[in-house]
């Protein structure tokens, strides 16, 4: 997303405030391709960078510039162009070792480091604890969520655009839904509409089937689209999240 330099600085300053408030030497932000409340949002919020494969890691320091480990050459080049972080590095093949090397490079062998513990792999934690026994790992996700809920005017415009894309996707679905059309075709129409107008993430769910009021049959529960063909008399339910 194309956020301004002012928005970048606002987020960076907010993260620096967390570092000071909680007495942290650094924040470890882990991004991956999963979907969920805390499962990459902190990372993307700070870096403005999408993870398209495996994981990426950003380390935000209290006393020096942040670093982003972005992946292979393709992902690193993309991060250098699009992320908020200038120092973007390739992953060597062992991301945890890369992070450890960076912490040692910055002279960080003791103190407190914030991390979303739900995102921190057990293997990484055991490795870091062995190599950096004087580091205390501190849960930081809820503090960062507080920042993410405090929306700037620029962010509010993005949310308004997302709402508009959702409305337009619903209208596109109405034009497509009819007997003989598959769930795949309906969701493709929704996502094509949003993608064409700038939607870069899609979480589109659908279900179709018979629903009779008062009958034991329940309203179809939305899930990932399938090849199921919509039939006459079906009810179609949707979740549209561009």
Regions found by a protein language model. Name each.
Residues 31, 117, 240:
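Glycine-rich, N-terminal phosphate-binding loop of Rossmann-like dinucleotide-binding domains
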Residues 53-60, 166-171, 232-233:
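Short, basic, helix/turn surface patches
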Residues 36-50, 131, 140-146, 150, ...:
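Short catalytic-site patches enriched in acidic/histidine residues
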Residues 32-34, 119, 210:
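Acidic, glycine-rich active-site loops and adjacent beta-strand->loop/helix elements
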Residues 1-101, 222:
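N-terminal accessory/capping or targeting/presequence segment of soluble
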Residues 27, 113, 236:
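Receiver (REC) domain switch-region micro-motif
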Residues 1, 119-120, 241-242:
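Short, charged beta-turn/beta-strand-edge "cap" motif at the junction between a beta-strand
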Residues 6-12, 20, 94-202:
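Flexible, acidic/His-enriched mid-domain "rim/lid" segments that flank
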